[in-house]
Amino acid sequence: MTAPTGPTGPAGPTGPTGPNVTATNAYAASTKGAAFTVLMSGTNVALPDAQTLSPDITVNGANDTFTVAEAGRYRVSYNINSVTPLTLGARLMVDGTEIEASNVMPQTAPLSRLSNDFLVDLAAGAKVSLQVYGYAGLVTLLPNSIGASLSMVRLS
């Protein structure tokens, strides 16, 4: 036989606040109509304008490679807007290797806007670059607007 349950005791103290993983984030853009030559094999896109980086994401001097200090799953999105429609592709490179989910393949019909949004697991110290490829020639990004942008937010 079981006795009746006794009264509920007082609430315990509140536990410590958990980590805010989304505090690891970055946004960078090219807004001044940059023009650059693209190689078929790929060229990193410089994002020197409108940079908002948390302290644990840094950028190199060329503004085209971002290093993440914290390992985790990241939501990444990018946009590339060219003045002229082109048959180029875009992708995210991590430590020199293409992230397959990020790839927007070169198309037979020219496009002036390429974008993608995906999740990727990054190791601490990973070097991340936005790259265009599959086209050999000059690319001019939209001026006075978002010619290209990259956003990364750590989710876990």
Question: Language-model segments: which ranges?
Answer:
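Extracellular jelly-roll beta-sandwich "head" domains, especially the C-terminal globular C1q domain
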Residues: 4-156
